[in-house]
A protein has these predicted regions:
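Non-transmembrane, amphipathic alpha-helical segments
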Residues: 50-53, 138, 211
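Divalent metal-dependent catalytic cores for phosphoryl transfer on phosphate-bearing substrates
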Residues: 46-47, 57, 70-185
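Generic alpha-helical secondary structure signal
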Residues: 22, 32-35, 39, 76, ...
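Long, highly charged amphipathic alpha-helices
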Residues: 64, 106-107, 214-218
Length: 240
């Protein structure tokens, strides 16, 4: 049962208007409070030297999560929930990087209730957010699995804030070496492949494995949850 349409406000108290029922991805993405949370989370991470986690990242994750769900035959509404989870998945970083997935889930709970989302859908979204981080999360539902795959696939040089630091920071170096990344979902073969184009003059493939092995394991587990296998392809060569 849906809540009545909710009237919501911007951070400065300005009325935003009634949220649609069912709640849409577009409404969540464009809401001033959501955009503020995303911006502040990214600003906090910038202060401690992390790669970009702002609107570019969450926008890409939302689109990929939606596409994963649809290509794997999941209903349109569940794909919308994956996109909403993608928009909100990193807002917990505005509080602290540690346990940001769980913190973000609780923040999303308050936002989505204010927006009038149906309770079962809220629980689906916040459990996905709370489980998206590779160190302490699991694909507890389809939305979580799609979110994990989408989040871990965003490796690209555009995420590096200061290219001058790539000599000193392995995470920046590996991200900067990636010229192209694409999550290829083969719905017929039920196989999901992360395809990367890496400049070996900047970072060796082994450095990628050194820092992203846990992400690859999380991606494999997520693919299995969706009934697919997972693989990694680098510069046209299948590695996993």
């Amino acid at each position: 049962m849906n809540h009545p349409s909710a009237r919501t406000t911007a951070p400065d108290g300005t009325p935003v208007g009634e949220a649609p029922s069912p709640l849409t991805f577009e409404y969540v993405r464009e809401h001033p409070r959501v955009r503020l949370y995303v911006r502040m989370a990214d600003a906090a991470l910038e202060q401690i030297g992390y790669t970009e986690h702002g609107e570019r990242h969450v926008g890409l994750v939302s689109r990929i999560a939606y596409n994963v769900m649809r290509r794997m035959g999941r209903p349109e509404r569940m794909a919308d929930l994956a996109a909403i989870a993608g928009t909100l998945h990193d807002i917990g970083n505005s509080v602290n990087r540690d346990h940001h997935a769980q913190t973000g889930g609780l923040m999303a709970l308050m936002l989505l209730r204010d927006f009038g989302m149906q309770e079962e859908e809220i629980l689906t979204v916040i459990s996905a957010i709370g489980n998206h981080h590779e160190n302490d999360g699991d694909p507890v539902n389809d939305v979580a699995a799609a979110l994990i795959l989408a989040d871990k696939s965003d490796v690209h040089r555009t995420r590096v804030r200061n290219p001058d630091m790539i000599k000193f920071d392995i995470h920046d170096r590996v991200n900067y070496a990636v010229e192209k990344s694409f999550l290829n979902v083969d719905e017929d073969q039920k196989h999901i492949t992360l395809e990367l184009t890496i400049d070996p003059k900047i970072s060796h493939v082994m450095e990628y494995f050194e820092i992203f092995m846990t992400r690859m394991l999380a991606s494999r587990k997520a693919a299995l949850h969706l009934g697919a296998t997972f693989g990694l392809q680098v510069n046209g060569n299948r590695l996993v």
